[in-house]
Regions:
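Intrinsically disordered, low-complexity regulatory regions
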Residues: 1-128
Length: 128
């Protein structure tokens, strides 16, 4: 670490330096496409339902998982589309723009915790 006094203050704030830039730029391309189609930051003008963006993100993830790399309409990566939808949800939930229409909370966290195998902390080992 350098000795500049600004560094200490900077390190106390949220950091973006650990996020790789290329995915952010690709998400930006998707967001530009969406702005042209729906209007820039349209979800901040009219509140949006969480299910709309969850469904869209999941459709893009499923298409990617099914072996389709790019969205046929935009030619941009399905993963970037999914990430853009999640970014919109994160932004909308931070303000008054999200209509939270999720179902009543279930037990997903508990199920995952109960069904997660304990593994050693050796980085070169794969859980069995």
């Amino acid at each position: 670490m350098d000795s500049n006094p600004k560094t200490q203050y900077g390190l106390a704030k949220p950091s973006i330096s650990k996020v790789p830039p290329l995915p952010l730029l690709t998400i930006g391309q998707v967001m530009m496409n969406g702005a042209a189609k729906y209007g820039q930051m349209n979800w901040r003008k009219d509140p949006v339902s969480s299910s709309t963006y969850y469904d869209a993100a999941m459709r893009h993830l499923m298409a990617w998982w099914d072996g389709q790399s790019n969205d046929p309409e935009t030619g941009l990566p399905h993963l970037a589309h999914a990430a853009a939808n999640l970014c919109i949800l994160l932004d909308a939930i931070s303000g008054p723009w999200l209509m939270d229409d999720r179902p009543i909370a279930g037990y997903t966290n508990e199920f995952i915790s109960d069904n997660t195998k304990k593994v050693s902390t050796h980085g070169d080992q794969v859980p069995t």
